[in-house]
């Protein structure tokens, strides 16, 4: 049953994005969707958290997460599309840097996103998406430095897109709108969902590993020192 829901979620999310990409540009509508789409994540996160806390069971968490993920991806994807259009329509707010700076950062951060996905696939036996949620808790490699290496890399990638477009408005949108919305999702919803699915192992991992900003992993206390 969840496979069918995932299929419908992919079709719905992709359909919304394609529809927005094919709409004639309208600055006012784009601004509303760029801000409203990102902040629309907040009530969805609140509702998802309430559903998790009402019955903190693994199977329920999987179902709730499926719907929350597709809602979040649809809203954030729509907001990114519209924020890009707003940024490109404001040439007077250009960043005084060559676009190659943004392109180089896009390549590096994009590669890190792929590495984080591979890390999660190999160590967590899954993906960070509802279509194949991880079955094990990934705690090493990139995930030993930060609990969310993929999210961090993706946010840097978005800033890099703004630098590549030389759009001050887009970079400001990422910093002031997108990042806060993503952080609320991670802190309010995802941490609780992972705690339900992985229990004490996740709580211990959360205590020693930062949520976003990387930190060198602590060496095991019983490690032999020569």
Residue ranges, per PLM feature:
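Histidine-centered phosphotransfer motif of kinases
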Residues: 140, 145-152
